[in-house]
Regions:
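Hydrophobic alpha-helical segments typical of transmembrane helices
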Residues: 65-69, 209, 221, 291, ...
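Juxtamembrane loop-helix boundary motifs flanking transmembrane segments in multi-pass membrane proteins
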Residues: 1-16, 83, 168, 177, ...
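Alpha-helical transmembrane segments of integral membrane proteins
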Residues: 25-29, 190-194, 198, 235, ...
Length: 391
């Protein structure tokens, strides 16, 4: 009996390989699109942290001190002063036109007030429509303001006879020694690519799995497919999805080797646990795709739901905004997305270097996704054997 089942699975798998090889859509979704996304997102952020972002200055004081502040601000890695504007209105207009991301405003009399210890005020404006650029330039401008204030205060203390140690102890009584964990380069490609790339692969698996089942109904070949499996829905799905599992796992292996072997992104646990996590993501995504088609039984609705679920995964996985800071309802709903659990495995293994056992809850969650098709197998079998496709 086992040989018979194995033969049926093999014949269905061979049939599926022929369908994949003769239909460009499969090749695009399974090979071309993932490879394009791998290269696109990693080369898009090839330099890591953005540098030399355009900023402007409004210097109404125009003294040696303020010019020194501007030169020092321009020396920051992320900031590049590209223009000096005569007024606040001109600088604001340039920022609204997208010519600059931020500008530094120094009012008239700043140096005189600083030397007289009258607390002059400088202003800096950042365009947070561009979150990354706005945040980085705001950080540079704020740092420069603090350094400028400290420099003036140090000069005043020196003039009053204070030593360097006394002046520094007064200006900075607590010295901060900061160390960035896991991504010390602040590389945005490390931050984003490790989740975006698996997320895109997951989305493509959702849609390919739904389409590959629905296409049987669309071409009215579902009974032929089920007949090759002796009307066993388990054998039919196993044989049909097995070639896709192999291809998608190869693609998952490729992005792991590409990210951690070629680009040398942090992978403190070694690549083998991440390959295992990639296999779990592939199987969980396929199982979820089967579940969606069995739940809705129509290609159009199942594909729409798969697309929606995949896109929302990027926001709710915790990659861009921490789940613990979300609404409690959203925190609970985050567990319904496979990418969330893959992200937790990535953080525990690749970034923190923990053994796989410490990510057991996420591993179990992905395995639970693999059980979803069992809830709709009977319904799916009935649909494939008796329902007629309606365009």
């Amino acid at each position: 009996m086992n040989n018979t089942v194995h033969n049926r699975i093999f014949r269905i798998a061979r049939r599926e390989v022929f369908r994949i090889a003769t239909r460009p859509l499969y090749l695009f979704c399974m090979i071309i699109a993932p490879l394009f996304c791998y290269l696109f997102f990693t080369t898009l952020m090839w330099n890591g942290l953005p540098t030399d972002m355009p900023a402007g200055v409004v210097d109404l004081d125009n003294t040696a001190t303020t010019r020194s502040i501007i030169r020092n601000l321009d020396a920051f890695q992320q900031t590049k002063i590209i223009a000096h504007y005569p007024s606040f209105a001109d600088a604001r207009k340039a920022m609204q036109q997208g010519k600059i991301y931020a500008f530094y405003y120094i009012p008239k009399g700043t140096t005189e007030k600083a030397l007289a210890s009258r607390q002059p005020k400088v202003s800096f404006y950042s365009n947070y429509s561009y979150l990354v650029a706005g945040s980085l330039l705001y950080k540079d401008q704020r740092t420069m303001s603090e350094l400028a204030g400290g420099a003036i205060g140090r000069a005043t203390l020196y003039a009053k006879g204070a030593t360097e140690d006394q002046a520094m102890a007064f200006l900075q009584p607590i010295v901060i020694d900061s160390h960035v964990l896991n991504n010390p380069w602040l590389n945005y490609s490390v931050y984003l690519s490790n989740t975006i790339i698996p997320g895109i692969l997951m989305l493509l698996i959702f849609m390919t799995t739904v389409y590959t089942i629905g296409s049987e109904m669309k071409t009215n070949t579902q009974k032929e497919w089920m007949g090759m499996a002796d009307n066993s829905i388990t054998v039919a799905l196993t044989g049909k999805l097995l070639p896709q599992t192999v291809v998608f796992f190869v693609m998952a292996t490729f992005y792991n080797v590409y990210l951690y072997g070629f680009l040398h992104y942090p992978c403190n646990s070694g690549i083998l646990p991440m390959l295992f996590a990639g296999l779990l993501l592939v199987l969980a995504s396929q199982a979820f795709g089967v579940f969606l088609f069995g739940l809705f039984t129509t290609v159009r609705l199942a594909l729409s739901t798969a697309s929606l679920w995949g896109v929302i995964s990027f926001s709710i996985s915790g990659m861009s905004f921490p789940v613990m800071a979300m609404n409690p309802v959203l925190q609970a709903l985050a567990n319904l997305f496979p990418l969330r659990h893959y992200f937790l495995i990535y953080v525990d293994l690749a970034l923190n270097g923990y053994p796989l056992i410490y990510a057991w809850h996420s591993v179990v969650a992905l395995m639970l996704f693999m059980l979803l098709p069992f809830f709709i197998l009977k319904r799916l079998r009935t649909v494939l054997l008796h329902y007629v496709y309606i365009p």
